[in-house]
Amino acid sequence: MARLNVLVYPDERLKIIAKPVVEVNDEIREIVDNMFETMYLEEGIGLAATQVNIHQRIITIDVEGTKENQYVLINPEIIDSCGETGIEEGCLSLPGFRGFVPRKEKVTIKALDRHGEEYTLSAEGLLAICIQHEIDHLNGIVFADYLSPLKRQRMKEKLLKLQKQLARQK
């Protein structure tokens, strides 16, 4: 397995809309394995392929971080949702920042697993929020897009400054 490079906002590649996976094969399973490896190393609970510059509809999730309840969502689609909720969300592509995002309390999705088998999943709580967050990434949306223009601009400026500082240290 390999650690993948996580794109950081305002990288324009985060705005690319991911394409559906045509065939779940060994190459896709390797991407999934590398995404889980990266997600755990970065201490995240979810990762969309878009965040690692792979523009296919693939998501990995483990909200508990135990590696016992891993979810692979290939070509995920929300087929039902209800209720209203929201929390201060964080994101590996927006390190050090959090923001409130309104979400559906419960979602039902259909997706393919790592073997290409279709399944349906009903989720609530943190898992439902994480699924919606990661599907947003596949659609070219980051949580900063839900914030006011002023907050988004401040976030962008701070992240660009941080990136410049890190580049000078290399």
From Swiss-Prot:
InterPro entries in the record: Peptide_deformylase, Peptide_deformylase_sf
Cofactor note: Binds 1 Fe(2+) ion.
Alphabetical UniProt keywords: Hydrolase, Iron, Metal-binding, Protein biosynthesis
Co-factor requirement: Fe(2+)
Family recorded in the similarity comment: Belongs to the polypeptide deformylase family.
Entry annotated with the keyword Hydrolase: yes
Top class in the EC scheme: hydrolase
SUPFAM superfamilies linked to this entry: Peptide deformylase
Organism: Pasteurella multocida (strain Pm70)
MF term (GO), any: metal ion binding
Database matches in Gene3D superfamilies: Peptide deformylase
Summary of the function given for this chain in its UniProt record: Removes the formyl group from the N-terminal Met of newly synthesized proteins. Requires at least a dipeptide for an efficient rate of reaction. N-terminal L-methionine is a prerequisite for activity but the enzyme has broad specificity at other positions.
Protein name, entry field: Peptide deformylase
